[in-house]
Amino acid sequence: MAAHSSCNFALTNPIISQIDSFSKKKLSVPLYFFSTRKALTNPWLGVVDSSLSLTSPVSALQTNRPRRIHKSAISSLPTANPDLVVSDAKKPKWSWRAIKSFAMGELEARKLKYPNTGTEALLMGILIEGTSFTSKFLRANKIMLYKVREETVKLLGKADMYFFSPEHPPLTEDAQRALDSALDQNLKAGGIGEVMPAHILLGIWSEVESPGHKILATLGFTDEKSKELESFASESGFLDE
């Protein structure tokens, strides 16, 4: 009697009947086909992001697969005087420290929200790189990064806080001449060895009216110290490390 009544209850209960009828049906379409880009609505949660909808296992793997990032190596720094380089065979090589110093200078110009990479930024780049003999030479003479930053803001002023620098702030004319001077120093020495941060610093110092030269002079850098650094850089086997 009890078994008979429970059977009647199952047949008369609409919820159980619906569940039972649904379980007997077979889906003719794969479950992941029902993935949709539309937002789902829920009376309690409001709009539910479509990312919660079911997706194909294959597409999920493709989505989670890390993207390949192609990196290009920088082989040289910009020059405004291509006549300095006659052919690829004679093209001087920039050391990795010089290239990193240049990249750090660009980044510092962006941090300060300046529209260009000037000699002051190249100077800060040498100090930020930090491992070269030139950067150690500057610090030994009490020319520190924070001091150069302070003098830069005093000399050039603060940039507009709402201004966004380009990804690669273009070089100012004096910064370009400083890099060309660094390149020229290497060529005058016979093009032997690499162009190093020491050559960049000497190029900055050669631009007397540039912000970088003025900041160096304010912090105690002199022609005597420039000649001292030049004597080190001209030695055979000097690697600026």
Curated annotation (Swiss-Prot):
Keyword terms, alphabetized: Chloroplast, Plastid, Repeat, Transit peptide
Location of the protein in the cell: Plastid, Chloroplast
Entries under Pfam families matching the protein: Clp_N
Region of interest (Repeat 1), residue spans: 94-159
Gene knockout outcome: No visible phenotype. Clpt1 and clpt2 double mutants show delayed development, reduced plant growth, and virescent, serrated leaves. Clpt1 and clpt2 double mutants are seedling lethal under autotrophic conditions.
Stretches assigned to the Clp R domain: 91-237
Gene Ontology molecular function: protein histidine kinase binding
Sequence segments annotated as region (Repeat 2): 171-237
Stored PROSITE patterns: CLP_R (PS51903)
Organelle targeting peptide span: 1-75
Location (main, coarse): plastid
GO cellular component, one term: plastid stroma
PANTHER family: ATP-DEPENDENT CLP PROTEASE ATP-BINDING SUBUNIT CLPT1, CHLOROPLASTIC, ATP-DEPENDENT CLP PROTEASE ATP-BINDING SUBUNIT CLPT2, CHLOROPLASTIC
Protein family per UniProt: Belongs to the ClpA/ClpB family.
Record text about domains: The MYFF motif is functionally important for stabilization of the overall ClpPR complex.
Subunit structure: Monomer and homodimer. The dimers monomerize before association to the P-ring. Component of the chloroplastic Clp protease core complex which consist of at least 16 proteins: CLPP4 (3 copies), CLPP5 (3 copies), CLPR4 (2 copies), ClpP1 (1 copy), CLPP6 (1 copy), CLPR2 (1 copy), CLPT1 (1 copy), CLPT2 (1 copy) and 3 copies of CLPP3 and/or CLPR1 and/or CLPR3. Interacts with AHK2. Interacts with CPN21. No interactions with CLPS1.
Record function comment: Accessory protein regulating the assembly of the plastidial Clp protease system. CLPT1 first binds to the heptameric P-ring containing the CLP3-6 subunits followed by CLPT2, and only then does the P-ring combine with the R-ring composed of the clpP1 and CLPR1-4 subunits. Once the core complex is fully assembled, it then associates to the CLPC chaperone partner to form the functional protease. CLPT2 and CLPT1 are partially redundant.
Protein name listed in UniProt: ATP-dependent Clp protease ATP-binding subunit CLPT2, chloroplastic
Source species: Arabidopsis thaliana (Mouse-ear cress)
Gene name per UniProt: CLPT2
